[in-house]
Design a protein with these regions (language model features):
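Actinobacteria-biased recognition of intrinsically disordered, low-complexity terminal regions
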Residues: 1-27, 224-250
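Hydrophobic, aromatic-enriched alpha-helical segments typical of multi-pass transmembrane helices
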Residues: 19-226
């Protein structure tokens, strides 16, 4: 494979490859951080916010009240990190099966998270304290937009899992194919299961499962790109050989 990674302004093939690799690794690292950051911040709020009950209240209601800015920031930062990871994922997987739509769908997941933070839900189900005990009869415009954010995020992530199943299977990465399929099925079952009983808990569990997949995939690509059928390792090897030829014998 002779394709060469290039970065505008680089003075030599070796420098170009090194710069591109650093940027790609930084983007992949965003995926590693996104999941643990979101889960830890959300969990701390679940345990500490007065009146919040995960068995009744979805995590998006944490965006309300005096401390709502914490969850808003959590949504937005985690979403932006997921979008950054999607850019890095495309650098690693493209070209090839799933190298276009896999990253795009992961990016859609990130966009859904950002939208969920920017457009907050209306007070409901008694949270924050003093809010109506039920669901408001009429939603605000931002609550209507917010209502589309979770489906966008979950659907994008679920489809991304199955898109990458095909890639991993084609590269005989059976473990990754099985893990991606299991993640997609679990997130679909938890988020689409009929009935409102336990919905907020199911969505929270689906969020943890989905973010775990993103973080584990990002970590694996950072440590061993070839393990997931990545062409990045081949490109880096080819660029290194080119740089060595350019330096000549020592």
């Amino acid at each position: 494979m002779t394709q060469e990674l290039t970065t505008p302004g680089a003075s030599a093939p070796g420098a170009s490859s090194e710069t591109t690799t650093r940027v790609t690794r930084a983007l992949l690292a965003c995926g590693v951080v996104a999941g643990p950051l979101y889960v830890v911040v959300a969990l701390l709020q679940v345990l500490s916010r007065d009146g919040f009950d995960l068995s009744r209240h979805p995590l998006s209601l944490l965006s309300l009240g005096d401390l709502g800015w914490i969850q808003i920031t959590n949504f937005v930062v985690a979403g932006l990190l997921a979008v950054a990871f999607a850019v890095g994922l495309r650098r690693v997987l493209h070209p090839g099966r799933g190298g276009t739509w896999g990253p795009r769908l992961v990016g859609g997941y990130g966009v859904g998270l950002v939208a969920g933070g920017v457009f907050v839900a209306d007070p409901a189900l008694g949270f924050p304290p003093g809010a109506p005990a039920g669901i408001p009869d009429q939603l605000s415009w931002h609550a209507v937009v917010h209502a589309f954010a979770p489906p966008l995020a979950f659907l994008s992530l679920i489809v991304a899992c199955f898109v990458l199943v095909r890639r991993f299977a084609a590269h005989r990465q059976r473990g990754w194919a099985a893990y991606s399929a299991a993640t997609g099925v679990a997130c679909l079952a938890l988020s689409a299961w009929p009935g409102q009983d336990g919905l907020s808990v199911r969505l929270a569990v689906a969020m943890v499962i989905g973010f775990a997949w993103v973080s584990v995939l990002a970590a694996r690509l950072l440590t061993d790109p070839a393990a997931t059928g990545s062409v990045h390792a081949e490109l880096q090897h080819a660029s290194t050989k080119t740089a060595r030829r350019g330096r000549g014998p020592t």
